[in-house]
UniProtKB/Swiss-Prot annotation:
One of its GO terms (biological process) is viral budding via host ESCRT complex. This is Gag polyprotein. GO terms for molecular function: RNA binding; structural constituent of virion; zinc ion binding. A motif (PPXY motif) lies at residues 162-165. The gene is gag. It comes from Friend murine leukemia virus (isolate FB29).
Amino acid sequence: MGQAVTTPLSLTLDHWKDVERTAHNLSVEVRKRRWVTFCSAEWPTFNVGWPRDGTFNPDIITQVKIKVFSPGPHGHPDQVPYIVTWEAIAVDPPPWVRPFVHPKPPLSLPPSAPSLPPEPPLSTPPQSSLYPALTSPLNTKPRPQVLPDSGGPLIDLLTEDPPPYRDPGPPSPDGNGDSGEVAPTEGAPDPSPMVSRLRGRKEPPVADSTTSQAFPLRLGGNGQYQYWPFSSSDLYNWKNNNPSFSEDPAKLTALIESVLLTHQPTWDDCQQLLGTLLTGEEKQRVLLEARKAVRGEDGRPTQLPNDINDAFPLERPDWDYNTQRGRNHLVHYRQLLLAGLQNAGRSPTNLAKVKGITQGPNESPSAFLERLKEAYRRYTPYDPEDPGQETNVAMSFIWQSAPDIGRKLERLEDLKSKTLGDLVREAEKIFNKRETPEEREERIRRETEEKEERRRAEDVQREKERDRRRHREMSKLLATVVSGQRQDRQGGERRRPQLDHDQCAYCKEKGHWARDCPKKPRGPRGPRPQASLLTLDD
């Protein structure tokens, strides 16, 4: 308790330098953020058993690789470097991965020559082994049955076939059939009535706490299915490493879908899984939606109680997983349970939540479309994959895309005839033509230099204009001064009083003119002073 759970994904992130070195040796490049996105969000949706926390299982990695390398529109070329790097780490594991890589079981070896764990010392009481009995070809003496310390009569897989699904094991005298069983390795699941009933607990020699190593149903060597329940560590990790159903129903639904696909749980396992990962109210809602999804013979949802109870019972059914009929019932039950999870995860209609989904600055159009479709599934009753809703999804995709992409999409010719796929391809072209950070820095630097040059040119032009304006104002001022002096002189002469026809202009007396004025001095007339003019140099 209190310790961080190590998963394949967290392990690679802790040794990211080694991951980058492996990718470099393969001549590819990987990014940490996309590494996390593909591992936890993309590859689990391929329905090949990939867990959200990653895995080093080469079979699952190969299935994901096939999906990634699929030709045509179903392929994912952008994920090729990541799955190739992950495969290289699993095939040729570095030292920090080797403890978490489990060797494949020797299925090709004959049953008489497998590698067996060493026998315990004689001084130590041997524990019950749940592995199939393997005898040496040279030793014809039957191997004695070894029982646990407790005296309870338990079913031993060494000598008997596992019981059918409905048939419980014989009751233990003390009421607990697992009281004397000791886990073969550390991290074994806690004892439970289911374990004591079916005697199916099995732990691998080296267990990874984040990846289940025991599927509930496995085909045994005798042709019958053997039952191994979920380990408590798996249930604990699933519950603590994922959000609640109310918080993020899509993520938890994807986890349960992966578990249903890879583990093939029984009816009891499904109830245990729902009881661990869901609250009581959430579980009831899921069961109700699953029962609504039951279809009749006509392929339509039915309301007949008998058909609903036969397909999705609320009480433990009598389904024997060793028969084809029982396995078919379990497969149908899991499908209905998954439909109930998907329907119960839909929130009340809230178009504001859908409109709030906008494309990030560095988000690809494909990733944005997936988030938009998920919002439609979560906050509306509409299916975004429905052809009737394609127009609404397309309009939301255009209006809520990045501003540069949205503007160009709106200007497309014959926009009404474009399908959603056409819009995504056009958006991808626009997104890929965006300038790189280096180009953006170069453009900003160039624009800054051009702006600075324009500013300097404007300053010079402004200074020249200021000088010309000052020169014109000074010229106007000087001209005004000169014209004012002239007007003063001319205006002074015009202000002389008007004389009568017989009045002297010199003495202002009547009866004579100025040339005959006796008061006017007689003598030579002096030169008239000239008015001085100011120039711009003065």
